[in-house]
Amino acid sequence: MALLEICCYSMECALTAQQNGADRVELCAAPKEGGLTPSLGVLKSVRQRVTIPVHPIIRPRGGDFCYSDGEFAAILEDVRTVRELGFPGLVTGVLDVDGNVDMPRMEKIMAAAGPLAVTFHRAFDMCANPLNTLNNLAELGVARVLTSGQKSDALQGLSKIMELIAHGDAPIIMAGAGVRAENLHHFLDAGVLEVHSSAGAWQASPMRYRNQGLSMSSDAHADEYSRYVVDGAAVAEMKGIIERHQAK
């Protein structure tokens, strides 16, 4: 049966995902940045309360995946922290200036991760040659690749995802970006073994007082009175679709 991973941005969302049938959680911060490394406090609270596998993302900033020496040092430190806290896996990825896997740096990440299952995230979708990259990741011992098939969403990239699956058994190819209940059957019919979804929506802040027109970010139009939360019903619906597909 296909595995359902839910992207979560808080301990509460991780619990919601777990309670509604998620098989695994990718734990992130900063949804507007596409997911950054969670704080130590969030990592500890999730580790204490969530019982399904949780894989934190290790990504120090938004943007591309070619990092400075200082950023890479932070990545290694965060990998060690996640390992010490007892998480079963993590999500990360590093490219060089030419869009190839930065093999020396990824080797250091794999060594720091030790027995943890490493997912190479959507840095894969920014790589120059996906099949060569997949071979490099297999050589490194990466467990899985999260990809949209190098398109803006996974449904558009499904043909590339199928090509990657046909390329070999390892790493596992996990489809993500825009995967929802309404299009999930396309991925299941294509033989995708793992799917990744945020399964949520932006929710209004409970604050009654609002200083409108004030932004905490460089985006002057950012809505500071909303937050992204996992929708338990959406998770349960996706899990049900997977179970019914398996029973066919």
UniProtKB/Swiss-Prot annotation:
Transmembrane segments: none
GO cellular component, one term: cytoplasm
Localization (cell): Cytoplasm
InterPro entries: CutC-like, CutC-like_dom_sf
Keywords from the UniProt entry: Cytoplasm
GO molecular function: copper ion binding
Family, per entry: Belongs to the CutC family.
NCBIfam families, per database record: PRK11572.1
Subunit comment: Homodimer.
UniProt-recorded name of the protein: PF03932 family protein CutC
Origin species: Escherichia coli O7:K1 (strain IAI39 / ExPEC)
